[in-house]
Amino acid sequence: MQRPSFWAYMVEELRRKFKDRTPLGSPVEIKDWCYANESTRENVFGWLGIGSRSVEKNFIEWALSRNDTAPPNMGGAGDFEMLHSLVAEKKYSQCLESGVSKGWSTLGILAALDQLNNGRLISIDMPYPKLHLEDWVGCCVPAGLHKRWDLLRLPDRNGLKRALSNYCSVDLYHYDSDKTYWGRWYAFNLVFPKMHKNSVF
């Protein structure tokens, strides 16, 4: 209660206790839909019209050294090289993400912006409650890539509004934050108006 920027988040968490948690169907139905509509990495690259690019080896080696010393309960890397390829090939400059953890996806995006010598990434990450992991958020991002990066340590409700106030449009939005229906609904409806026909969510 001593952190006013988190009040809206706490109020929304309380409201969700009284909402339908699965308005799109049961968890089993939702999972079945996902399996029925999944695709391969190669197909996704084809749909996006991009080739595969790799993050520079020295960045990867540095990130791995940090990853090995980070707490184990912060999640994995995901397909950060797909994000890297997307930004590099499409020459995106206005990038946004919510959910950072150790920062592998952040690294992929920032390494592409560094190659392009253009653009900015605004990341939003709410510190893990009571886990004392704040100092590890973004730990896999080398200091040399920080010049194109703004990290907002806020809940999505505060952070997204602040981030979007800095962009006239958004080229890429990488969403790896609140996985609930209502969390996604809030973020999607806030960000979509800032996206254009060539944007990727």
Predicted regions span which residues?
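S-adenosylmethionine/decaboxylated-SAM
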Residues: 69-201
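Conserved Class I S-adenosyl-L-methionine-dependent methyltransferase catalytic core
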Residues: 46-68, 73-86
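Membrane-proximal basic amphipathic "stem/tether" segments
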Residues: 1-56, 60-61
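Short, isolated positions within intrinsically disordered regulatory regions of eukaryotic proteins
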Residues: 10-14, 18, 37-39, 51, ...
